[in-house]
């Protein structure tokens, strides 16, 4: 056990985490040179295309140092803000972490957030300055930033280039010297932390565990503590980047994959504790909460007959991603679908893309919303996440909305842009400090509803991509809010309703109807598009009707004949307008997301 090192890599997006993992794997000789490919740890196509890590992967490496063989377990963590729950699980199964910072970019908002999780878990942190071969690299400045913003001593920081492999050997030696070996009791009853789980078509649900005390053997009966269910261990494997390697036992301090032959992942929830069924441990490993959805949106199949396929697809994705929550809902405009809870915007995009890609579905997503707490006039309290379920205004005594604490790091020349943008979104400044002469850290309390739409994109475009952003949910605060409905041809389209601050309802409504006017296809009758709050119409646009030339078949002839046909057409249009239905294209539902 003294020769085991469990560590993970903490980094902001694009600071070179997956490349560094590739280099460590290569240096330890775990993968032959001919099998080596970029982003070896990122297994999903979406991960490779977007260059992000979503699922935490792990790999077991062997390394020789001063004549002894060591086992290094590298636990990869996602860097994006939505997946911080994956980070907290991965970090809880390590003793140390490499803090990777780009030598040209410096400290970013996400880096700070993840370092705090690591410090909470009392990990030994090794600062690593990556990309030092870039012309713009400034390792001294970056070390000062780390010391100033995080308070870590950087005198022993390592300089590496993951791309060229510079300094990788020294890094491995340092990992063995500075990261402590696991401390667990080998003779105690089995106690293991499940820090990831996924579904394999042949083996069923698999749990990736870190054994804290005791060991897990093939054939042993284990108990999952939160569900109280017992399962038999069918197989055990060590994770390896190309194919897992079978083993008979996973010992104290090691990580491994446990095969239980289960049909679904909900029985082995991430963050749960596994123990021996005959002699269970007294208490579970603490510090884990089930992932809470942060953003909700409706997902509907474009072809309503495929509702059951969507249900199956969501069930299968849930096997891999225990954080998705969903329940069926119906919409007048879109038919049958599901209300799905996500961890954040990127998570929502990734899930939608995976549903469309892996299950070949065409989906419409409604505008994302958050959970509101309402106190009604009769004193009762309710929570609402779908705007169309909001009770009438006269029944609501007060309405509270969730807030987040956002940390934004931005170059000082864009400071004005960012402050203007955040205050337009009802942000309240809590703190502002200069990291160095060119970069500023801002801390704001912002209503969650204001950041779920396109806050991140707007922040990036307003700062030429230089700002970084991270958030954590804080509390509910009272807000003066109203439901904005969109009516097309007199009918409310429930899927387009959004909840907005009252003082902004007019401009939001106006922007929405203008956007919709461009999108709604012209009909044979004119279509009114209106925005309303309660029963009051606050904005309107009209889509003009298409003229059909009914007099085309009259060659010459009497004017009264033509007039008769035109009158008849007018009557028909009137009737059509009264009963006509307007088919809304997919873009109409996205228009809600685009208004600022």
Swiss-Prot record:
GTP binds at residues 14-19, 130-133. Gene3D superfamilies: 3.30.70.240, Elongation factor 4, C-terminal domain, Elongation Factor G (Translational Gtpase), domain 3, P-loop containing nucleotide triphosphate hydrolases, Translation factors. InterPro entries: EF-4 (IPR006297), EFG_III/V (IPR035647), EFG_V-like (IPR000640), EFTu-like_2 (IPR004161), G_TR_CS (IPR031157), LepA_C_sf (IPR038363), LepA_CTD (IPR013842), LepA_IV (IPR035654). It holds the Pfam family GTP_EFTU_D2. Its EC number is 3.6.5.n1. Residues 2-183 form the tr-type G domain. One of its GO terms (cellular component) is plasma membrane. It is a peripheral membrane protein. Its main location: membrane. It is found in: Cell inner membrane. SUPFAM superfamilies: EF-G C-terminal domain-like (SSF54980), P-loop containing nucleoside triphosphate hydrolases (SSF52540). One of its GO terms (biological process) is positive regulation of translation. It catalyses: GTP + H2O = GDP + phosphate + H(+). Keywords: Cell inner membrane, Cell membrane, GTP-binding, Hydrolase, Membrane, Nucleotide-binding, Protein biosynthesis. Belongs to the TRAFAC class translation factor GTPase superfamily. Classic translation factor GTPase family. LepA subfamily. NCBIfam families: lepA (TIGR01393), small_GTP (TIGR00231). Required for accurate and efficient protein synthesis under certain stress conditions. May act as a fidelity factor of the translation reaction, by catalyzing a one-codon backward translocation of tRNAs on improperly translocated ribosomes. Back-translocation proceeds from a post-translocation (POST) complex to a pre-translocation (PRE) complex, thus giving elongation factor G a second chance to translocate the tRNAs correctly. Binds to ribosomes in a GTP-dependent manner. This is Elongation factor 4. It comes from Wolinella succinogenes (strain ATCC 29543 / DSM 1740 / CCUG 13145 / JCM 31913 / LMG 7466 / NCTC 11488 / FDC 602W).
